[in-house]
Amino acid sequence: MNLAAYFPVLLFLIVGTGLGVALVSIGKILGPNKPDTEKNAPYECGFEAFEDARMKFDVRYYLVAILFIIFDLETAFLFPWGVALRDIGWPGFMAMMIFLLEFLLGFAYIWKKGGLDWE
């Protein structure tokens, strides 16, 4: 395998990273640093802060976010499978049906355990 063909990519990564680090460093060194309480306060659309900026979220929001990511990944696997269905034949079809069955069983388990209830 000829690794010389990948040299431009490596050079691009090195130059890009170096330029980014250099610009951030120059800004940090040359920029004024005069913090005060007003600058350090959290910004809420021009209004005074209503509550503490570090308020706690209910765990159910995180559960819904994780479930969304899981089922979003399922959709990401479904699209290329649908495009290549004629090329992969019955073995690919059966593999995806097993994959979908696992997700449906997981969804049924979450539903039965009350993971989707908000009360």
Swiss-Prot record:
Subcellular location(s) of the protein: Cell inner membrane
In the bilayer, the protein is annotated as: Multi-pass membrane protein
Its predominant location is membrane
| Entry's EC annotation | 7.1.1.-
Question: Which terms in the Gene Ontology molecular function aspect does this entry carry?
Answer: NADH dehydrogenase (ubiquinone) activity; NADH:ubiquinone reductase (non-electrogenic) activity; quinone binding
Show the PANTHER family listed in the entry: NADH-UBIQUINONE OXIDOREDUCTASE CHAIN 3
Report what the protein is called.
Answer: NADH-quinone oxidoreductase subunit A
Organism of origin is Paraburkholderia xenovorans (strain LB400)
Print the organism lineage. Answer: Bacteria, Pseudomonadati, Pseudomonadota, Betaproteobacteria, Burkholderiales
